Amino acid sequence: MKGVRMKLVYIASPLRGEILSEKDYSKNIKKATEYCEKACSLGVLAFAPHLYFTQFYNDTIPEQREKGLEMGLSMLEKCEELWVMGKNISQGMRGEIAHAKNLGIPIYHVEMPDDIMYYPVSADNHALLGQHSCMPDSRDKDYMGKI
């Protein structure tokens, strides 16, 4: 589709835990891929830094890991939202969350990322209702006739 602008969303999910095994690493890469696929199916452009930067930086080499984290934070600055996937927040994710807060980037915590219904986009591909969607004087006790 020509001329359609998609919202750029940064996907934060664990790459490695406290103890990294090859099995956990592969599982986390697979999950990040699934999260991006689901997010893209909702009409956003999803970016997970650990899917991209691990193609040429080795996360087990400290200097290369730091370079990948630095580049990820630089990419986060260009994103419109940060989606934090799951309940397990890694050290890298904590840095991403702190950076997004400092920049004023909206952060959405998707506690159950395996179920697309919990993603912060409605079924009709529009953003979920936010403060701007509320009715004027919505603190009134009587809403009759105002909708």
Descriptions of predicted regions:
Residues 1-147:
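Conserved catalytic or regulatory cores that recognize and/or transform ribose-phosphate-containing ligands
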